[in-house]
Design a protein with these regions (language model features):
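N-terminal glycine-rich FAD/FM-binding segment characteristic of electron-transfer flavoproteins
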Residues: 1-336
């Protein structure tokens, strides 16, 4: 949106550079789309690309399928690319499969790794809600590969002055019928999903169950969780059991939605650290934790799923007491 080279784009660039270095006789060409792509091209000037191609103009500032496919198709044809790597963002996951069809190629989304053996490229991706991993190749070209954000260390080279070649694209009026009229987002303090956070905090259904005094303390649970999120800037996830409670007429955390769900039909985040509270560590939930590097859990049951190898550390304790103490410690070190 601001013309800079975002982290997902720098991750895709790093993957492309790595691939180009391992493929005999290959060349790296960078293609950019946006209202003004010169700043992004200059930011990537030190990546070693042979050419920089850009499609720019007001029509390409918005994320819109009709104009995105026109721009991406023009870049692919101008570059004569046989392998096309792109960030697996919502914008390009929507548009690039259509581009692959237009240029007679194939597309694969949610790619987590790439390898080269005998000068042939293979990709890795997960299936069946992250339960099965597949490695495969394609002979069809062009091959569009959308790399999932968070799977590759982003390129962090030197900026410079790039020689940018502008690729002209005619935009029919019919392609401009869809417009972005504005953005709606919660205030930064109310935002609970933070994909770039260092810590993923997962709340389970136990937060809304009867506590040792026989009563349900949902308001207290909400206060503890939101207080921790504000102080730590962690991202909030939820187990399927907790998210499903809203449809069962039971007490729920008012800020928890299906968008927070981790595992099974939910997201598979890639935060460096994870802390699960008040959930049992059952397989449908822990499957969403495959890419969390350091996993810890708090549960009163010493025989829960977390104790069976699903977490690196299990604290057998009351999550209400633990989080109250954690919030108190954070309050001493975190500015108000």
């Amino acid at each position: 949106m601001d013309g800079s080279l975002g982290r997902p784009a720098r991750e895709a660039l790093a993957a492309a550079r790595s691939l180009q270095a391992r493929l005999t006789g290959s060349a790296l060409i960078v293609g950019l789309v946006g209202a003004d792509v010169k700043a992004a091209a200059d930011a990537a000037a030190g990546c070693g690309a042979e050419r920089f191609l850009g499609v720019s103009g007001a029509a390409f500032a918005q994320s819109r399928y009709a104009t995105d496919v026109l721009a991406a198709e023009a870049l692919c044809r101008d570059a004569g690319a046989t392998l096309i790597l792109a960030p697996g963002t919502s914008r390009w996951c929507r548009a690039l499969p259509g581009v692959a069809h237009r240029v007679g190629g194939r597309a694969d989304t949610h790619v987590t790794d790439l390898a080269v053996a005998d000068d042939a490229v293979s990709i890795v991706r997960w299936y069946y809600r992250q339960r099965m991993e597949a490695t495969f190749r394609r002979t069809q070209r062009p091959w569009v590969i959308l790399v999932d954000p968070g799977c590759v260390s982003p390129w962090d080279g030197a900026a410079g002055i790039a020689s940018l070649h502008a690729v002209p694209v005619e935009v029919p009026a019919a392609c401009l019928r869809t417009t972005v009229t504005g953005l709606q987002a919660p205030a930064s303090g109310a935002q609970t999903i933070r994909p770039d956070a260092d810590l993923l905090f997962v709340a389970g259904a136990g937060w809304t169950k009867a506590q040792p005094d026989g009563k349900v303390h949902t308001p207290d649970a909400a206060g503890l969780i939101l207080g921790f999120l504000r102080k730590s800037q962690a991202s909030l996830g939820g187990s399927k059991s907790l998210v499903d409670l809203s449809g069962e007429g039971q007490a729920v955390l008012p800020f928890m939605t299906h968008l927070n769900q981790i595992g099974q039909t939910g997201a598979t985040p890639r935060h460096p650290k994870g802390l699960a509270t008040c959930c049992h560590g059952e397989e449908p939930h822990t499957v969403g934790w495959r890419f969390v590097s350091e996993r810890r859990a708090v549960n009163l049951d010493p025989n829960c799923g977390w104790a069976r190898g699903k977490a690196d550390v299990l604290y057998v304790a009351d999550a209400f007491a633990v989080m109250a103490k954690v919030n108190a410690l954070l309050a001493e070190t975190t500015p108000a």
